[in-house]
A protein has these predicted regions:
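Active-site entrance/lid segments in N-terminal catalytic domains of soluble metabolic enzymes
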Residues: 1-207, 234-239
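Alpha/beta catalytic cores of nucleotide-metabolism and tRNA/nucleoside-modifying enzymes
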Residues: 1-17, 21, 182-210, 214-372
Length: 372
């Protein structure tokens, strides 16, 4: 029998027959640490040193990207108690440190660390071996995140390896070309649903992160039916605080007293870069309709991102792309909306917390014709 797999826009959440919550405010959209079930993706056009506090004060979890110096990543991870991303080779070096092969490093055996092994292909046995090693050292106190995976059954291997968080979904991010270039893909809603079912069946403790393809608020709520967390890149890039290169220009030309909106390409040609200290001023002008502001956004496998991580690296064929997105909001405004929308979804499903929201009823959409 044909087994159809579903994306986020193939399903809708169904309300309970009768609900007993009197207000959406009775729903608690935060996890046990008081944070939203959302991570900012470790991308160099999303997270930077200067905006970590912006994310955290808005209750968004952060993973520090690999373009920042290794020792500085560790320092920031400790300062803010957040995950920092490492490459496969850096993860191997960390293993050697705990094995006593390195006499001097930025790490200490009496410290705890939150490490994200940031890899596109989380199906490699070599990665699983590294994960087992990192979780087996008696002198290591490591909370470990890794991935990405696009086969539900791989979850069992990461659970057995002692991994704490696994990132699911390959190829569906707006700056990712893996699916279109390689043909590798697993529709995201079905992937996290089937991964969750395996987790539930085996009593797994490794948390599921839906990472990629989140294009709107509705996708977040649908992902959270089965995922513990959602990881977001493109939506956060469209916030004024994001790390992407920021350009601006008047959004129109004045021709004989008439406003003629400028073609997109002229903004990139003639627009000037906005320094971070001018973001607030630029955002006020944007809200007043005086400026158009654009953010560079790129996948971390693009050659530009590879060079930003290591200027001397041998560049690989890119499975990502670079483009510009129009700034649409600031972080606090976006978060205010998401909290309200998530609470509303929880009230429809009579869910007072995120645990109650798990396994909310849903149906397959035969047509997608409501307002996006």
């Amino acid at each position: 029998m044909f087994d159809a797999k579903l994306g986020y826009d193939d399903v809708s959440i169904v309300p309970e027959v009768v609900t007993y919550m009197e207000s959406r405010k009775q729903g608690n959209p935060y996890d046990e640490n008081g944070m939203l079930p959302i991570y900012a993706s470790p991308m160099d056009t999303v997270v930077c040193e200067e905006n970590i506090e912006d994310f955290l004060k808005n209750k968004i979890n952060v993973v520090i990207p690999r373009n920042i110096d290794f020792c500085r990543r560790i320092e920031l991870g400790k300062k803010y108690d957040v995950f920092f991303a490492v490459s496969m080779s850096e993860a191997e070096d960390i293993c050697k440190f705990y094995e006593g092969e390195y006499g001097s490093t930025c790490m200490r055996t009496d410290e705890s660390y939150k490490i994200c092994i940031d890899l596109a292909n989380g199906h490699m046995d070599k990665l699983l071996t590294i994960c087992r090693k990192l979780k087996s050292f008696e002198n290591a106190h490591i909370t470990l995140m890794t991935g990405n995976i696009a086969n539900p059954e791989t979850y069992v291997h990461y659970e057995d390896a002692g991994v704490d968080y696994v990132r699911c979904i390959i190829g569906s991010g707006s700056a990712c070309l893996t699916a279109s270039c390689t043909g590798v893909f697993y529709p995201p809603f079905s992937l996290i649903k089937e991964t969750y079912e395996i987790k539930k069946r085996i009593g797994g403790r490794c948390k599921i992160i839906a990472d990629g393809g989140i294009k709107d608020f509705r996708h977040i709520q649908r992902a959270l039916i089965y995922a513990d967390y959602v990881m977001i890149g493109g939506l956060f890039n469209k916030a004024i605080e994001s790390a992407g290169k920021t350009t601006y220009g008047k959004s129109y030309w004045n021709v004989n007293g008439n406003k003629i909106f400028r073609p997109l390409k002229t903004l990139f040609t003639y627009g000037r870069e906005i320094p971070r200290e001018k973001f607030d001023e630029a955002y006020r002008d944007f809200k007043a309709g005086k400026l158009a502001i654009w953010k560079q956004y790129r996948g971390m496998s693009t050659k530009e991102a590879q060079k930003n991580i290591d200027a001397n690296a041998v560049l690989k064929t890119a499975e990502g792309k670079t483009f510009y997105q129009k700034v649409e909001y600031n972080l606090s405004g976006w978060v205010e909306n998401e909290v309200s929308f998530l609470r509303s979804a929880m009230s429809y499903t009579d869910s007072r917390n995120l645990r109650d929201f798990k396994e909310s009823k849903w149906v397959i959409n035969m047509s997608f014709n409501y307002n996006k």
